[in-house]
Regions:
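Active-site cofactor/cluster-binding pocket
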Residues: 1-164
């Protein structure tokens, strides 16, 4: 089983991103479950969401405390929240940022890093700083665990196509 924890701020689509990635993984024949975390979050407040996927049925529907991968859709979040808490040694970080690797906050447990200037791309393409779908593409490129075609199909054939 592979576990992903999404970090973002309210309104950035971290919860939606987990659902979109689950749909793409299902499209490729995997078992996947996204687990939103709701509380008293408001727009701009830190939020988390979770995703598990496997070749076998998934029965565990709890929060993820020791993820294999972190997807952070907000480039400033690591300054105020310990996004690396519990990351497995050698884990993967997929981070939205316009900074070079040397200037990005990266914990010692991180083994693989994927960076994406998602805000600039989103502003150019969508005219809004909606980075969640771009970060899924960065996840696909960084890990190779889902194809861009599956991501595209899951977005085109679902309710997510109207989300931004």
């Amino acid at each position: 089983m592979y576990e992903v924890r999404f970090h973002g701020r309210g309104g950035q689509g971290a919860v939606t991103a987990a659902s979109m990635l689950a749909a793409a993984l299902l499209e490729e024949g995997k078992y996947a479950v996204s687990i939103p975390s709701f509380g008293f979050e408001r727009r701009g407040a830190p939020v988390v969401s979770f995703l598990r996927f496997s070749d076998r049925e998934i029965r565990q529907l709890t929060n993820i405390y020791t993820p294999d991968c972190l997807i952070c859709v907000d480039p400033t979040l690591a300054k105020s929240v310990d996004i690396f808490s519990g990351l497995k040694p050698g884990g993967t970080l997929v981070q939205a940022t316009n900074k070079p690797l040397e200037q990005v906050i990266i914990a010692d447990t991180v083994g693989v890093v994927g960076l994406c200037d998602a805000i600039a791309i989103a502003l150019e393409v969508f005219k809004r700083p909606i980075t969640n779908t771009l970060m899924l593409g960065a996840f696909a490129k960084t890990t190779g665990m889902v194809s861009l075609d599956a991501l595209r199909r899951s977005l085109e054939d679902s309710d997510f196509r109207d989300a931004g």
